Amino acid sequence: MTYEGARSITGPFLAVLGASGAVVGFVAGLGELLGYGVRLISGYLSDRTGKYWPITILGYILNLFAVPLLALAGSWQLAAILMITERIGKAIRTPARDAMLSHATSEVGRGWGFGLHEAMDQIGAIAGPLIVALVLYLRGGYQTGFAVLLIPALLAIIVLLVARHLYPTPRELEASQAVLTGKGLPGTFWLYLAGVAFIAAGYVDYPLIAYHLGKGSLVASNWIPVLYAVAMGADALAALIFGYLYDRIGIYVLAIAALVSSMFAPLVFLGGFAMALVGMVIWGIGMGAQESVLRAAVANMISIDRRGTAYGVFNTIYGIFWFAGSALMGMLYDFSAGYVVAFSVATQLLSVLIMLYVGKKATT
């Protein structure tokens, strides 16, 4: 609720503070780049030290409390620093959290388990933007919206501490330990990362989408977070569906998801309100598949002792290509929205081909 509520308005908030489209794309991409780079270190440390809970809790504190501080930002430079801090906090917690989730989901099916996690996550992701939309509707302003999000931030930390008390040793939840042959991470994992890289590079971050919708006056400002909430609703449902399908047909489900999500960019950037609404639903479907199945597949490729490291590598590669794609699409947008569409569609379709090949190798 906290950081998704904030992400629904950071694009237009930066615009109000005087940032250009290139700046919005660069800040969004840089936050992801630095954040995902930190995950490489965080994942390695979580495996070496076994301190999954302390690392996770530290990350959540940074991740959540950077958001209400945005209410005090008076320049786009300061806002950008806080946005990047929020991403770094998420980076610190994510590998350790995902490793703990991989243990907890081993009995129910990792696709379904990670899908359920993503769906529950989206309950807050829907509520957060809607709360911000209500604040804007009541003429509270962007700063007021950020300040109100302090409440769910505090509640989230409380719930996290309760979970730490109830389940102090997550590895004990593992039903069985996967066997990894040879040294290092398996070749299939690296091939899989190539497909992930194309998905990340071509997926337009919401701040740039919100910037486009606001700058072109396609929708009223209070509708921008509502569209994000709609996307998060589609995300939640898609996570459950694709997670369920992954446990039955494997990697092939990612090819299906990428093919579907490749259609969002033309609808969002080249149409009016109705097409943008449909495009945001498809955007949310793609995000749901990414946030559930992409992580579940890593757990099934990697042994228990290397899983934190593998998630760190996975997230770092994802972040590097997300940054490169976001920065490039921000610059492309300043020339033409059509260039953004062409780049996004092309990279998504390339990922389809790679995932089909990975799926074929996994079954032979």
Question: Which residue stretches match the model-derived regions?
Answer:
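Helix-loop boundary and gating motifs at the non-cytosolic
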Residues: 1-33, 191-220, 224
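Helix-to-loop junctions at the C-terminal end of transmembrane segments
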Residues: 38-51, 136, 238-250, 333
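Structural signature of the two symmetry-related core transmembrane helices
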Residues: 54-68, 150, 252-267
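Helix-loop junctions at membrane interfaces in 12-TM secondary transporters
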Residues: 69-83, 268-279
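Cytoplasmic helix-loop-helix junction between adjacent transmembrane helices
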Residues: 82-123
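Symmetry-related core transmembrane helices of the 12-TM Major Facilitator Superfamily/SLC fold
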Residues: 144-161, 340-356
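Flexible cytoplasmic inter-helical loops of multi-pass small-molecule transporters
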Residues: 162-182
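C-terminal transmembrane helical hairpin of 12-TM major facilitator-type secondary transporters
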Residues: 250-294
